[in-house]
From Swiss-Prot:
Keyword GTP-binding: no
Role played: Part of a complex that catalyzes the reversible cleavage of acetyl-CoA, allowing growth on acetate as sole source of carbon and energy. Probably maintains the overall quaternary structure of the ACDS complex.
Phylogenetic lineage: Archaea, Methanobacteriati, Methanobacteriota, Stenosarchaea group, Methanomicrobia
InterPro entries: Ac-CoA_synth_d_su_TIM-brl, ACDS_complex_subunit, CO_DH/Ac-CoA_synth_dsu, Dihydropteroate_synth-like_sf
Protein name per the record: Acetyl-CoA decarbonylase/synthase complex subunit delta 2
Source organism (scientific name): Methanosarcina acetivorans (strain ATCC 35395 / DSM 2834 / JCM 12185 / C2A)
GO biological process: methanogenesis, from acetate; one-carbon metabolic process
Family, as annotated: Belongs to the CdhD family.
Gene field: cdhD2
Amino acid sequence: MAKKMKLSDITNMFAGMDVEALEGVTIEGDIEIDLGGLGGGFDPMLAAALGQESAILAQHFARLAGMFGYPVGIGAPAAPAVSPALAAPKLKDLIPAKFDVANIAEWATEIQEVPIGNTSADGGSRGKRVMLGGEKALPFYFDAPMPNRNQVTIDVFDMRIGLAKAVKENYDEVMDSPGEWAKKNVEKFNADMITIHLISTDPLIKDTPAKEAAKTVEEVLQAVDVPIAIGGSGNPQKDPEVLARAAEVSEGERCLLASASLNLDYAAIAEAALKYDHDVLSWTQLDMNAQKELNRKLMKQCNVPRDRIIMDPTTAALGYGLDYAYTNMERIRLAALMGDDELTFPMSSGTTNAWGARESWMVSSPLKEDSDWGPREYRGPIWEIVTGLSLAIAGNDLFMMMHPTSVAVLKQITQTLFGMIDTEQVDVANWIGAEV
């Protein structure tokens, strides 16, 4: 049995010696603490705590001995043994997974189908009816086919306006006649629909009376037999009156009234739509929560049926604007598929807004050190095509466009993805030398 000593014994041992300090001497030993008559067992956690406190106490004793001239070396505690890490089992087979877009459990809600235009069978005079919506998945998956293809409506204005040169050269001779303008869009540029914008009604432009503007709507209805959308000037005070009068003269044709928004009298527009058999374009500005709010008010406050609501979440031009527009539309469509019944409606895009970016129509960059932008005759239409195609992938159904080349290219791409146009198979494995 090892001999036990107290710290006082060590002090007494050197009391009669002329020793000021001990150098190169290590005193090894264990410190015991008598706990007396403690009962209740010795908990492992208590043991660990006492061990830590004992080590601290030993250090204090060593420092105290040094103060009296007897430095005491304290050996560092041994590092605890570390168990070797177990080797991860080798993976023999990958976990089986299958992507079945037609049967994704979270996508349990179908997008509402909304018709635009009444044929004679429906009580109108349109030659065809356009159907939007009905999707059960994101667009263009071959194993989850879209029930209705994308549609394009080409813009017409009730007065001559300033347009980019690349656009204007296609319409210059008809810009003073909305009826002829609409007819050219249908007969030459293959428009699925026509959007007539009554911008002259703006009090800051011509302040055309609503009654006179309604005559322009009648002119367009007589010039073409495709469904039409009717837009105001964007003036929140004037638009409800203008759209109500336009709805009256086009009664029974099931036009799309563009648009109801939170910053104007949406109830008046909804009332006109219900009274004269039209659809409502629910327009918000890149805000999904505002879109939900407006849709909810149209349904709950104004009693607009679900099959008469189309959303326009706003389209911004290429750059950050397109990023926001795409993300907003995709979030809306995913939320709708997952059951948000305030968002389960087809979407419309003002793709013409692409021409609002100066890069689409300017001759060249205003910065001398900038790179060459290329010919605007190509650049502008491509700007509009990319805007529309991006939003088509996000789930957009209806495109409001202007340049005939943009219309033709977007229709060809979306109809090919839809399955309407057969194309030659491309060897994607030989992508370097493939001709597309």
